[in-house]
């Protein structure tokens, strides 16, 4: 299987010569929702439009950087996983095996002839967190869609949801978070929709 990668452009170089998480500006950390963002003055928002647009571009197009003196491409979903996901040990590490997984997954997702992928894995490979990252990434850019978790038991599926999917969603910055109905840390479903309101008679 041959998978074409985007042209090698705007290659970022980290000081450590390897993947490093970009620091999230402290002033933006205080903003939890798009509603909070709207309350800020326009001159403040103007300062951050370029930063936010660049994050959306990386999510859409992927990201080139120098990894141990070698130009390396990661997909947008992989970028979201490395930069914005929170797992049991904190931020995920870059692994070449994971990079290949995300590239293959992106090709599978783009191919309308393909019904999915079979992935044979070993223990502690990080697959559950990667799959959770893919789920949150897709769910937050899709409309009128449902994303489920299938496991060997309902309890295991629920544990993956509460321990992996929800923390990744919570860790997303406000500009990637759709409007959410319900609690911040739900037990059964993440509902990205406008909260229901009651009809009242006047």
Annotate the PLM regions.
Residues 1-202:
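Phosphate/NTP-binding elements of NTP-utilizing enzymes
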């Amino acid at each position: 299987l041959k998978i074409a990668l985007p042209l090698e452009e705007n290659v970022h170089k980290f000081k450590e010569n390897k993947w490093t998480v970009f620091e999230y500006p402290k002033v933006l950390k205080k903003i939890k929702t798009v509603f909070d963002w709207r309350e800020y003055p326009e001159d403040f928002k103007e300062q951050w439009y370029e930063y936010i647009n660049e994050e959306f571009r990386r999510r859409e197009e992927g990201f080139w950087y120098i990894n141990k003196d070698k130009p390396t491409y990661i997909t947008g979903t992989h970028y979201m996983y490395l930069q914005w996901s929170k797992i049991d040990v904190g931020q995920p590490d870059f692994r070449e095996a994971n990079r290949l997984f995300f590239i293959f997954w992106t090709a599978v997702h783009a191919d309308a002839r393909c019904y999915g992928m079979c992935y044979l894995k070993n223990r502690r490979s990080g697959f559950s967190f990667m799959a959770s990252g893919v789920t949150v990434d897709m769910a937050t850019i899709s409309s009128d869609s449902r994303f489920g978790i299938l496991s060997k038991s309902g309890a295991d599926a629920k544990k993956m949801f509460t321990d992996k999917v929800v923390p990744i969603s919570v860790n997303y910055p406000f500009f990637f978070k759709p409007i959410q109905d319900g609690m911040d840390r739900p037990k059964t479903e993440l509902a990205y929709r406008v909260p229901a309101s009651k009809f009242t008679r006047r």
